[in-house]
């Protein structure tokens, strides 16, 4: 949840002087370090070149000069996939064994017992390519998949995306293929990080990276999502 405008104003006002600040989330109440938060806000103002200007968060003033302009989101092309019917290569079948051998040759970082434990899913792409999905590693509370782009004859690996993602699919509205990874920082699930990529007709290309900050047992799913890379997806 986000702070309301009124809560944000109260927080910023409290940071301009010595204050005792507490946040209540459900039945949990946490103390916020006024000095630590004020230092973080001051650093934000400094980085954005807002110190001593009317738009500064904490150290406001009447100086008038240009502030740091936000960067333009990079545009990432994505291609809509018409045939979105997946197929399964079953354990023990000849085609399964052939594709598994190709995947192993292209990347040897997966756990053999896990790689051999499940069927391989094939996602159609465009330009006579497909995406293969196999289990790479399965831990106590999360798993990682092995993804690779192959030709539609399943004879050659053209791109490896191993150990980065654990979900694949198609966008419901625009039909482009994506891979997504979301991983817990530890078992409680109170801190996460992740990334996304989309098919642009040639390769899967990164579209986002994010994290939820530090690990705090009170926030299942993470306290908030903090993007470290964002983009504008343009579907063709």
Sequence positions of predicted segments:
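Mid-length scaffold segments of soluble, non-membrane domains
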Residues: 1, 133, 137-163
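Internal interaction segment
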Residues: 1-102, 210-235
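Short, solvent-exposed coil/turn segments at beta-strand boundaries
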Residues: 16-18, 124-130, 152-154, 170-179, ...
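Exposed beta-strand-loop-beta-strand "reactive/processing" segments of non-cytosolic proteins
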Residues: 120-139
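Short aromatic loop motif centered on NTY/YTY
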Residues: 158-236
